[in-house]
Amino acid sequence: MLHNWIRVFYSDNGVLTDYSVEAQNNADTIPLELVAGQDYVYVGQYFPFNNLFFQLDTANTVVSVMSAQYWDGKVWRDAVDFIDSTKLLGKTLARNGVIQWSPDRNNSWLKTEDTTDRGAPTELSTLEIYELHWMRLKVSVSLSAGTIIKDLGYAFTANHMLSSIDPEINEYLVPWGGVSKTNWDEQIQLASNHVVADLRSRGLVVAPGNVLRFDDVSLATAYRTLQIIYSRLGEAFAPRKQDAQENYEKLLNLKGFTFDTNRNGLAEKQEIAGTTGGLVR
């Protein structure tokens, strides 16, 4: 089951494997021993998108740089303004994190109506998938053997944001998830899905990729994450849960978000915070 409609294919020297379900199921993993100049991760969604969250099972240990390309209807174009928060000491996919990028404003990111048609990437011609925008990820140096990712999706806030609101939050990791739990990434991803659902109910977005700037929704997502965490900690945490809920609703009701209203993957002048929003009483 796809909780977010994200198609994920791993190309191992041109041989495609569909990991769309595994990418959104924490019980499964995806081997990602990318070989430089040969292997790619292809990601398709209905609308352009400028970020993805990687949750790792086994980190890469080799110094390597990740980059992104998108399909413009004719060729793969290099994405610009690429930011990789999975990078640690020059090693991409060394920790959980978000990658962000932007399409080149001089070359549009076009939808591929059918991967079997002319105008579609030849690398995907053995598939038959309709109406998606495709991008691919590659690395400069082959990743270490045994690199494995656990999840690929969206996360609109980070663990340090939770700690800034509740400095004691990490004391609840073991009571919440046992001795093996070391972060709140799964709860952050769930909260991010809740945020998208609530924004959709307000008519502000139609897909997670429409959220172009995290600073618009990161604090709201943090409070929604805290609600989820407190809900399993018993009645003593009911006041904190209520406070988190009130702050969450207040933040989502603010007017002024940067959403991709024209569906081109770019945060343009008319879309930057202040031009899109809704006030709910």
Spans of features found by a protein language model:
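Signature of Asx- and small-polar-rich beta-strand/turn repeats characteristic
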Residues: 1-156
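Conserved short "hinge" loops at termini or chain/domain junctions
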Residues: 1-5, 13-15, 73-77, 150-215, ...
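Generic intrinsically disordered, low-complexity segments enriched for polar/acidic and small residues
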Residues: 6-7, 16, 37-39, 151-153, ...
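Arginine residue identity/basic-tract feature
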Residues: 7, 77, 95, 105, ...
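Charged, low-complexity surface segments at secondary-structure and domain boundaries
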Residues: 103-122, 167-179, 206, 210, ...
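Internal mixed-charge
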Residues: 185-258
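Preference for long, well-ordered alpha-helical segments
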Residues: 255-258, 263-267
